Regions:
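Non-heme Fe(II)/2-oxoglutarate
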Residues: 6-96
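Catalytic micro-motifs at enzyme active sites that drive phosphoryl/nucleotidyl and oxygen chemistry
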Residues: 4-8, 189-191
Length: 207
């Protein structure tokens, strides 16, 4: 499914991005969904004036410091997914999908958005040369089975630093992903959540 969408990703404008439904095998997805980690003291606030959410690292990992070992507080399915994303096969397939050569996982986080959370339009590499990018693309995978039809809160793609320039916003957040390349113009965000259904997701980057 994923590699079949590579041309769409690479040709999309104003920068490469792609939305994919059912990127994860259905049975495996069900196990990930059922064992998505509950909120405890391992989660931390990612709030500032531009955004609001809570996040959780995998095991002893931090941004730009991936440690490929089990997290015994998580299910075997989450450990399998994490180890797969650290594999040569995963980086090769993501390189083929995006057209961007990557060799390793750079970050992996659980991200939970709830009512009142948001992320203002932003881009990660404004004024930075491509050879100095911290990572080459970002992927968010959603686990929100009961997401209200058409509700705000999925990570959108925009043409600029204003929500009036949104060109794509996912509204099916049950086993779906959005991936976008990192450029100085890779504007994205998520609209203010007005409903009570949470948005469980993971976010990972590669370099």
């Amino acid at each position: 499914i994923i590699l079949g969408e590579s041309q769409t990703f690479q040709k999309n404008q104003p920068f490469p991005y792609g939305f994919i439904k059912n990127p994860i095998n259905e049975k495996f997805y069900e196990e990930l969904y059922k064992t998505y980690p509950s909120v405890d003291d391992k989660w931390y606030s990612a709030d500032d004036y531009t955004r609001s959410s809570i996040k959780r690292h995998f095991g002893r990992c931090k941004a730009n410091n991936i440690i490929d070992e089990d997290d015994t507080s998580l299910s075997e399915y989450w450990n399998l997914l994490f180890h797969y994303l650290n594999s040569k096969e995963a980086t090769e397939k993501m390189s083929e999908y995006t057209g961007l050569k990557v060799t390793k996982l750079r970050s992996f986080n659980f991200v939970l958005n709830r009512k009142g959370d948001f992320n203002l339009p932003h881009s990660h590499h404004v004024g930075i040369k491509p050879e100095d990018y911290e990572y080459k693309f970002t992927v968010l995978i959603y686990f929100a089975k009961d997401w209200p039809k058409g509700a705000p809160g999925g990570t959108y793609i925009s043409e600029g630093e204003d929500e009036s320039t949104i060109i794509f916003e996912p509204t099916d957040l049950d086993n779906s992903w959005i991936c976008f390349s990192e450029t100085p113009n890779s504007w994205h965000g998520s609209r203010y959540m007005t409903h009570d259904v949470p948005r469980p997701s993971i976010q990972f980057t590669m370099v």
